[in-house]
């Protein structure tokens, strides 16, 4: 290899000159791999420095033939397939002295026209297969089809077009005319000069920081997939600059829109060190265990173009390190240094960038470029704007709580949503959480100039045909999580959620174009707020008597909130009434009477029952507004209300607190306990405001008893708030009356690390604090999981004990670790005398087996239904289930009866700590169930089903993926749609298959459990009859 010592100093090198120099001195160095015919499955072509330089010469000749005299500088435009022609076109046009406009294919016609007029474009070039746009004729601009990439990469040597300018002569030549995203209006031109590009080359000049160089230099010699638009600054920086300046080998993506399959195609067909992937594509990948598994083979991934949602990053970074980079059209690539993998969301900007973080609000700072004469070779933004000394990026960051040099990108200044009351909030984190839901492809939060936040949701393509209510019902638990992270004024109410079926406008880099979205969906947004104001029926109240007023007020409350079975003395706030309901009720009542009356929100807050509010309104109608309250009467009423609670209980009945009753286990457990005569009262603590209605609907659909309302009281709680966010009245009532707590609510996500469960421990502490101050010593039942001990070394220590697990390597994942930590914390509380503890480790929960309602079904989200659905599509059943071949499953309706026996035992259980391993004591194997399962399916489908080894079954399912996806997209096969759930769990099935052949899994001690529960002791094994019930539930 020849010497290149004669090249100019870093930061003062002209890109066309560097390309010709390295082609001469390092002709065989591979710059790019480009997929043959745009398809990775056909292999990749190497593009060496020599071939690249020759392709530029070939295009120079073609441009000369099209444009005429090379001495006349013109502005030309190129729009094409996402391939190497973008880079070739940039260098060729620069060599010839032309200015190249790169207009994004995503631009509207209006956007294209605006850029043409701004740039003075005279000639339009497009690759084959792209529309040349009819508007060009109106503008009288000639257009032509570009040469195919294969033609340009012909290695036959051509006459070189030499770029002969010196640094001072060429630094102001334009490499390309890029443009802003247009997220706040029409796109604006941003010129990229050769001097601008050279500032990226200036990364070489930056000194070590924390032992590391800027990322471009640090990653020298790596082979990276550049899965970004190559007309965009991100693709240019990490595609062209990185290959030429930093000696990366850049693998270019397949043609077409950059989506998840583009990444997977590359991972399948070429060896990579890393991949450069946009946050929007990472979002899709985070929902695919299959692609995540492939991604984990890389050394790291890089991303830019917008923030990675926390929920997405938390899923990816345990598998492969994430290294974010920051860039902008005006400032190219912002030099940063690699951070610790756990700090993947943060940037460490190199000091030689000359950026400052200037306070913008209490928690946010704006990134600002400040011109420094000593940093001229490393400050690209002042090449773009030479007249400026300071450039405000409008990008807002938050400082790391422990490391002051680390900064996390939060949003653009324009992203802030400002409500009509002046309150501001950041919608991006909430949107990121919403799109982590598998049914949601995009989310947009708005509320500009409004009194309330609203949400638009765009479902993913597999759920577009579902009804709005079905989608919102499924996503609502995620909304509840979002609301816990939002300030109270910004929280999203169900009435302010709308499903749309038109994709949101996007910027060229794939991020949401907020202004365009607001404009494009104005009608939908207005409909949300119109519905909230006018959508409920008006109420007319004849204010002739207090009885009539009371009836009318009840009707008004039901109209604005949907509350049912509201009694006159029910506190509406404990029934789920919130601040938005108050505002709407005040407005409705103020216009409900024939005579003028203004019902203020304060009146509703101080009169929270139908009776009290009716009395207040009636008094107003009769006598005008009265400010005085009869304190003595109110005091006597309050005393009478709670006096009995402070007297000794007349009979030993249970008063039980349950967290999380609206879920699967909670619904059945509430039914069991309410039908137990020894249970007098149950407090149902749930996070959602509409838990009562959800419980009613769930009970009806499952065929459960609907008579539990007399025992159950629904209370909204917040796991992370002080005292769980309970009112003083509810808190005191629980402390005075409760005899037991069943802690059932816990986030179920097997992909999250332990740290993500920290809010659960805050809630656990609050429950223990209630135990400390309770009148009775509370029995605390913690619903744990066998995942807390799935790595128990039974070959050394025997069966998993009915005792505290002393090994912290016993859990199999973050979820299991969180359960184990909770077990140990509660054990400490029990040993200090605060409570009496029972830990219930729940195993595989199967579907119900009793004859119940249509809603009683083994949820299809579980892995067993997924196996059946996939087997139906394949017409083949697996011979075994690997390490899960032993069927120690318990149907959910029987499981909750077992829990009921443990919570309300015939004979009191003695001891401060009790541990129960809840698994079926009778354990047939999967192969025992196969004959009956096979026979049932063959009758149902009048077709034969094979039985094949699990490894082969997994291979068939993987091989059928393209067919399944195709049939789903065409809507031609219900079995294909159902089989998708199996595709999503391929990695899990492979984990089952990876265990030792013939492994029967762990053994679990159950002696104490069976002694305390006769139902479990006498439980039947999983049988053909049970499978028949489950198959019927699934529609087979």
UniProtKB/Swiss-Prot annotation:
Q: Which residues form the Carrier domain?
A: 544-621
**What is the name attached to this protein's record?**
Non-canonical non-ribosomal peptide synthetase FUB8
Could you provide one GO biological process annotation from this protein's UniProt record? biosynthetic process
| Described function | Non-canonical non-ribosomal peptide synthetase; part of the gene cluster that mediates the biosynthesis of fusaric acid, a mycotoxin with low to moderate toxicity to animals and humans, but with high phytotoxic properties. L-aspartate is suggested as fusaric acid amino acid precursor that is activated and further processed to O-acetyl-L-homoserine by cluster enzymes aspartate kinase FUB3 and homoserine O-acetyltransferase FUB5, as well as enzymes of the primary metabolism.
Region: Adenylation (A) domain, residue numbers: 21-343
Originating organism: Gibberella fujikuroi (strain CBS 195.34 / IMI 58289 / NRRL A-6831)
Pathway, per UniProt? Mycotoxin biosynthesis
Q: How is it used?
A: Fusaric acid is phytotoxic to plants such as cotton and banana. It has been shown to induce programmed cell death in plants. In addition to a mild toxicity to animals, fusaric acid exhibits acanthamoebicidal, antioomycete, and antimycobacterial activities.
Q: Which UniProt keywords apply?
A: Multifunctional enzyme, NADP, Oxidoreductase, Phosphopantetheine, Phosphoprotein, Transferase
Q: Is Ribonucleoprotein a UniProt keyword of this protein?
A: no
Q: What happens when the gene is disrupted?
A: Impairs the production of fusaric acid.
**Which residues are annotated with the PTM O-(pantetheine 4'-phosphoryl)serine?**
579
Q: What class of enzyme is it?
A: transferase
Q: What is its EC number?
A: 2.3.1.-
> A Gene Ontology molecular-function term?
oxidoreductase activity
Please give the record's comment on domains. Contains three distinct domains: an adenylation (A) domain that activates the substrate amino acid which is subsequently covalently linked as a thioester (aminoacyl-S-PCP) to the 4'-phosphopantetheine prosthetic group of the second domain, the peptidyl carrier protein (PCP) domain, as well as a thioester reductase (TR) release domain.
Region entry Thioester reductase (TR) domain, spans? 658-899
Checking InterPro entries in the record gives: ACP-like_sf (IPR036736), Adenylate-forming_Reductase (IPR051414), AMP-binding_CS (IPR020845), AMP-dep_synth/lig_dom (IPR000873), ANL_N_sf (IPR042099), Far_NAD-bd (IPR013120), NAD(P)-bd_dom_sf (IPR036291), PKS_PP-bd (IPR020806)
